[in-house]
Amino acid sequence: MVPNYSTEETVKRIHVDCPVSGRHSYIYIMVPTVYSIIFIIGIFGNSLVVIVIYCYMKLKTVASIFLLNLALADLCFLITLPLWAAYTAMEYQWPFGNCLCKLASAGISFNLYASVFLLTCLSIDRYLAIVHPVKSRIRRTMFVARVTCIVIWLLAGVASLPVIIHRNIFFAENLNMTVCGFRYDNNNTTLRVGLGLSKNLLGFLIPFLIILTSYTLIWKTLKKAYQIQRNKTRNDDIFKMIVAIVFFFFFSWIPHQVFTFLDVLIQLHVITDCKITDIVDTAMPFTICIAYFNNCLNPFFYVFFGKNFKKYFLQLIKYIPPNVSTHPSLTTKMSSLSYRPPENIRLPTKKTAGSFDAE
């Protein structure tokens, strides 16, 4: 929808060129329902992740620090979902005021950048740990990981500033309702393009290429170990985890990124047909739902792929205190979205042809 701004008041009045764009009754039922499901499962799952990592795993590894911050970033976003569920259920009537409009919108943007930056750092950490296990030990320290997380939170905050500044509530005169959206000056094309393309490039394309490259190099290293290892079960598990990470990340975000780019074209008046605008505005909430499932399902990667995480998770469910462990010698190493693969992969010699352990 492309607004034309007419007056400047406490609540600015706008006129919408395509007033029926994206306004369908089934959206007002389906999308809030999906948001509610994501909220319940996401809050429960990510809260368990925080408890397990912080209380049971004790932040002993670099990966655990990144994973804890990833779960916290997801929680920061998830607490805003009830607002968006209500907003959609009320047919895009925003009743919560300008402050919550800005904060809830910034929460989405902040989570997008924080999550993708953390996943990128996790992929780089996995690459260094597996491909360069000895050389990387000096750089892969707990201190460096904590500083990196602080920098990521700051960068995500900076990237979300335009949302806080330019997202406001407006009164749509021909819709007779108050909406929460962006206000663009008619001649300000830089902001329109910048917000959309930054989400496309910084929030998806560049991180995805880094993640894909990192895990491709990891797989090549594991493939070499395949050729001289008798028992491939553990390597198969790692490979499945790698494929799941890349596949899930790409396919959960690509629909939203494509329609975000189309929305930029609409804002630039490259696309002016209201029928196409309606398709974009109708599809956008559903692409957002697909992307939001990333926040909801991340914890299940830990359970399915993380043997140590699964052990601690079961302890938590059974109310076993963190200091009680049936296998105290087990490590807490995890991977980027599951267990952490071995710190040092030993390429077996003839005497140790069946080993593939972590130090």
From Swiss-Prot:
The keyword Cell inner membrane does not apply. GO terms for cellular component: plasma membrane. The chain crosses the membrane at residues 26-55, 62-89, 99-125, 142-165, 191-216, 240-268, 279-304. It is found in: Cell membrane. Gene3D superfamilies: Rhodopsin 7-helix transmembrane proteins. Residues 56-61, 126-141, 217-239, 305-359 are cytoplasmic. It comes from the Eukaryota. GO terms for molecular function: angiotensin type I receptor activity; angiotensin type II receptor activity; bradykinin receptor binding; protein heterodimerization activity. Glycans are attached at residues 4, 176, 187-188. Angiotensin II binds at residues 17, 167, 182, 184, 199. Disulfide bonds join 18-274, 101-180. It is a multi-pass membrane protein. GO terms for biological process: calcium-mediated signaling; cell chemotaxis; G protein-coupled receptor signaling pathway; inflammatory response; kidney development; maintenance of blood vessel diameter homeostasis by renin-angiotensin; positive regulation of blood vessel endothelial cell proliferation involved in sprouting angiogenesis; positive regulation of cytosolic calcium ion concentration. C-terminal Ser or Thr residues may be phosphorylated. Residues 1-25, 90-98, 166-190, 269-278 are extracellular. Pfam families: 7tm_1. Keywords: Cell membrane, Disulfide bond, G-protein coupled receptor, Glycoprotein, Membrane, Receptor, Transducer, Transmembrane, Transmembrane helix. Receptor for angiotensin II, a vasoconstricting peptide, which acts as a key regulator of blood pressure and sodium retention by the kidney. The activated receptor in turn couples to G-alpha proteins G(q) (GNAQ, GNA11, GNA14 or GNA15) and thus activates phospholipase C and increases the cytosolic Ca(2+) concentrations, which in turn triggers cellular responses such as stimulation of protein kinase C. Belongs to the G-protein coupled receptor 1 family. This is Type-1 angiotensin II receptor. It comes from Gallus gallus.
